[in-house]
């Protein structure tokens, strides 16, 4: 053994070939600060070996290196800029030493090589991969850019266009594509990986392969003519401006850095990467996006822990077909859980099957599946008008009309047709689970399972624990949702649960703005372009359905009369009374026509202004800041109340529910991350300017306490240790 660290070791393999093996405690390898330091120490030993002829890098895990240790990011990002820059210089000196070894080097890559893992293998001369490879640089999705030389080496290896596509979009690619673009040199089966790697190294050692020529382009300026450079970087900047926009600075910074570094060799180019990385790491966007990643891990870990002793349903059923039922049936079948789809009429069943078939055909068109797979999935969705087969069902979700009487009747009837241990769930969006459970003989086997539309796209499923729901029932439904590829978050019961409970105060803020003379078009524009929502409130209401929102508004008002009972006729009432139900009938705040792809395209409709005039004061202009404050304060206050009342268990779960269920702008990180970034005291000062608008604008006492004591909602993060100690970690 030449060297042994906590996360990697170095040993002789054969005939002057050494192997450097990543083998961290736990299930995966991460390129954390300790591993970078250990890699430097291993290279120090290696540089003294006069008999060294070649070096093989490999992993003892199912994945090569899954990336940097993102749990370290928040503390690293708090380190002063100069100190972070010094540590990056140190880390890059380690990878440069790997790249500068006077012998051929090869990385044998299995499974994942992402972020720092990818940057590590870019420093070797050759790369062999297994068919399960996923390799790429996802840093821009975290609000940063590659910092270990990825933005320097990748363009010089692949050419500007392929590298820009991977880096700017934060992409990873599979083995076949990686081979095609030159990111790996060969793909071999796992059992042949080491044998193949040694064979390549031997060829390089004997001179049959020119490893020096392979290495040289990574040390030089990017080989691009002025015209080629202008085309590549102009197109890339245009694409990034269109897709990322101003709220996500990392992709544009990465492209501009690669452009600026193109005319330099490795050292100068790495300095430019360093100078771009450090300011990005100190942005609120990076902290928010890293926070989302960590919260996602927390939420998924919690679901995994909850279901570790639970068997996933092997046969499921959906009550109520149509678009929603068909979407749920598709998602279950697509992920391997066969489903019976029951309705009371053929028309709805046909609609549900058509929806499932449409979604499968899209997968076929994209090349994700073949005809055989499509037929196999669709055959596991069984449409029926009766309860045949329900005696074999492990889990049922009801997705009928949002009417408590109908839902109770359907659930009570179904309970008599299934086994005593079968779990029942309702896809209600607002009706309290306790109310629906009152119709059942076994309420302990019942809970809420709230999907979001469109089911196949929206990651969140709210699992609602009723007063009598058993732990086993919750765990079984969480297991089913996880199997469907969704992110389940357990919340406690109340009208609207968590997501809709906090959404309708936001809509109430919108209604009050329109009542006071705001133009809905400007409100939409400000909330989309300035705050960052994917849709403004008017557009969102049209997509949700004005009729659906009108009904839900009444349910929420009954549940929370003190705050949500309005004393005036609002825009939603006016549109509902005029049968303008939104996209579903082509008329809402906007008029909708199908575009060339058959998707609804919104257009202005002067008639809506006349309708809204009856529920609005004289038009007046509001500043962007005032619009954002009046829209967001009711939502933020309600989110805080839900945490204080135990409806949602933690800030992390609340923020992920908002991001995954409502599209809360990820660069803000969620409501609690946004609050922590603003500071509770600053938020309180802002909110108090609007408390005259009514109870929705009154800040909860818990938040006032946070402001008084300057306390954040997330645990405070301490800056990483000084860079000197990180080097020798």
Curated annotation (Swiss-Prot):
Official protein name in the record: Fatty acid oxidation complex subunit alpha
UniProt xrefs under HAMAP family: FadB
GO biological process terms on file: fatty acid beta-oxidation
Binding site for substrate: 296, 500, 660
Residue ranges, annotated region (Disordered): 708-729
Region span, 3-hydroxyacyl-CoA dehydrogenase: 311-729
Family: In the N-terminal section; belongs to the enoyl-CoA hydratase/isomerase family. In the C-terminal section; belongs to the 3-hydroxyacyl-CoA dehydrogenase family.
């Amino acid at each position: 053994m030449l060297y042994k660290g906590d996360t990697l070791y170095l040993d002789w393999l054969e005939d002057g070939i050494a192997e450097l093996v990543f083998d961290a405690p736990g299930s995966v390898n991460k390129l954390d600060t300790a591993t970078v330091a250990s890699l430097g120490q291993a290279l120090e030993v290696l540089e003294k070996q006069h008999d060294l002829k070649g070096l093989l890098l490999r992993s003892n895990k199912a994945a090569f290196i899954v990336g940097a240790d993102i749990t370290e990011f928040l503390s690293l990002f708090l380190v002063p800029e100069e100190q972070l820059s010094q540590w990056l210089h140190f880390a890059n000196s380690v990878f440069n030493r790997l790249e500068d070894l006077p012998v051929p080097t090869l990385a044998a890559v299995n499974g994942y090589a992402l972020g720092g893992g990818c940057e590590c293998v870019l420093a070797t001369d050759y790369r062999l991969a297994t068919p399960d490879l996923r390799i790429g640089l996802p840093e821009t999705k975290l609000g940063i850019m590659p910092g270990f030389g990825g933005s320097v080496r990748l363009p010089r290896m692949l050419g500007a266009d392929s590298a820009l596509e991977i880096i700017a979009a934060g992409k990873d690619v599979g083995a076949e594509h990686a081979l095609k673009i030159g990111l790996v040199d060969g793909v071999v089966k796992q059992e042949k990986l080491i044998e193949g790697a040694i064979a390549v190294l031997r060829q390089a050692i004997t001179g049959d392969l020119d490893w020096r020529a392979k290495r040289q382009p990574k040390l030089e300026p990017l080989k691009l003519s002025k015209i080629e450079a202008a085309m590549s970087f102009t197109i890339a900047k245009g694409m990034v401006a269109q897709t990322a926009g101003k709220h996500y600075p990392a992709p544009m910074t990465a492209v501009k850095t690669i452009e600026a570094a193109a005319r330099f060799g490795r050292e100068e180019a790495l300095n430019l990467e360093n100078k771009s990385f450090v300011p990005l790491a100190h942005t609120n966007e990076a902290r928010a996006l890293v926070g989302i990643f960590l919260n996602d891990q927390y939420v998924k870990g919690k679901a995994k822990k909850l279901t570790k002793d639970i068997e996933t349903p092997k046969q499921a059923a959906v009550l109520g077909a149509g678009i929603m039922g068909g979407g749920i049936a598709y998602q279950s079948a697509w992920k391997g859980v066969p489903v019976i789809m029951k309705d009371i009429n053929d028309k709805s069943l046909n609609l549900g099957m058509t929806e499932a078939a449409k979604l499968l055909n899209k997968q076929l068109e994209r090349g994700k599946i073949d005809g055989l797979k499509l037929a196999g999935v669709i055959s596991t969705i069984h449409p029926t008008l009766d309860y045949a087969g329900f005696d074999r069902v492990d889990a049922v979700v009801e997705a009928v009309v949002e009417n408590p009487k109908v839902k109770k009747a359907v659930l009570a009837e179904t309970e008599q047709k299934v086994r005593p241990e079968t779990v029942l769930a309702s896809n209600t969006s607002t009706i309290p689970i306790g109310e629906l459970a009152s119709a059942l003989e076994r309420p302990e086997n019942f809970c809420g399972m709230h999907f979001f539309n469109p089911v196949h796209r929206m990651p969140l499923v709210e699992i609602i624990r009723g007063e009598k729901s058993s732990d086993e029932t919750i765990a079984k439904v969480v297991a089913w949702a996880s199997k469907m590829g969704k992110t389940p978050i357990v919340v406690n019961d109340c009208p609207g649960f968590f997501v809709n409970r906090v959404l309708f105060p936001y809509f109430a803020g919108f209604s009050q703005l329109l009542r006071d003379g705001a133009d809905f078009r400007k409100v939409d524009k400000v909330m989309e372009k300035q705050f960052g929502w994917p849709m403004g409130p008017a557009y969102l209401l049209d997509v949700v359905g004005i009729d659906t929102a009108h009904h839900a508004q009444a349910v929420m008002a009954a549940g929370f009369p003190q705050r949500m009972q309005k004393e005036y006729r609002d825009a939603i009432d006016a549109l509902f009374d005029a049968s303008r139900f939104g996209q579903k009938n082509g008329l809402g705040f906007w008029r909708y026509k199908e575009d060339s792809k058959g998707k609804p395209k919104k257009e202005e409709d002067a008639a809506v202004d006349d309708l809204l005039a009856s529920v609005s004061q004289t038009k007046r202009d509001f500043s962007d800041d005032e619009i954002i404050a009046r829209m967001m304060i009711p939502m933020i206050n309600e989110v805080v109340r839900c945490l204080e009342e135990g409806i949602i268990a933690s800030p992390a779960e609340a923020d992920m529910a908002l991001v995954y269920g409502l599209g809360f702008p990820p660069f803000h990180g969620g409501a609690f991350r946004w609050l922590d970034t603003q500071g509770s005291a600053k938020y309180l000062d802002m909110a108090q300017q609007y408390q005259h608008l009514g109870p929705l604008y009154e800040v909860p006492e818990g938040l006032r306490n946070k402001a008084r004591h300057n306390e954040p909602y997330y645990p405070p993060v301490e800056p990483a240790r000084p860079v000197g100690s990180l080097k020798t970690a």
